Amino acid sequence: AYLARGGNLFILTDTGRQEVMNPFLSKLGIKMEEYQLAQSSADFSPNLILAKATRESEKLTFGFKDDFPKYDLRVSMPGCVALTCSDNDYGFQYTPILETNAKGVWIEKEQTDLQESPVECNASAGEKEQTYITAYALSRQLKDKEQRIIISGDADCISNTELTLSREGYRSGNFNLIIE
C-alpha cells in the first residue's frame, strides 16, 4: 500500500539476504545477484568494494555531478552484492548510481568468507571481471507526485563505521551518498 501510494524508500540489502529480498525487489524490477562481489586489492580485504558514481547519476543531484567526480569519491561497501535491472516495464525510470571498476571486481562464486581469505577471479567457475552496479535510483510519476526509491547492494555502507572510517588511499563518499 505504501509503494502504491507513491511512498519514497531507501532499501538496503546485504549478502545472504537474497532469498528474503528478491521476491520484494522483483516487484520493483530489481534483482540481487546470488553471490557477493570481490575486489582485488593489496590494501584491503576482498569483500570491500569501492564503488564510484556512474555517469548516469550526474543528472540526479549536484553532489553526483560535481563532488563525486571532482574529488574521486568512493563509497565503501563491505560485503556487497551486485544488482541487476529486469527488462520488464514496472513504470519506473532506472538510473544506476553506483558501480564498480571494470577490472579487479567480480562475483565470487567459490568462496563465501571474503574477510581474510585471498581470492582470485576464476573464469572456469563462471567468474568474470567487469563493471557491476551496486546501487540504483528508481523514480516514477504517480498522479501529481514523483516517487523516488534508492536500492543499495550493501547495508553497511551507511553504518556508523563506514560513515566515519578513514582508509588510506581513497576519499570516502559514504556520507555524501546519504545527504544527496
Residue ranges of predicted features:
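Acidic, S/T/G-rich, low-cysteine, solvent-exposed domains in lumenal/extracellular/periplasmic regions
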Residues: 1-180
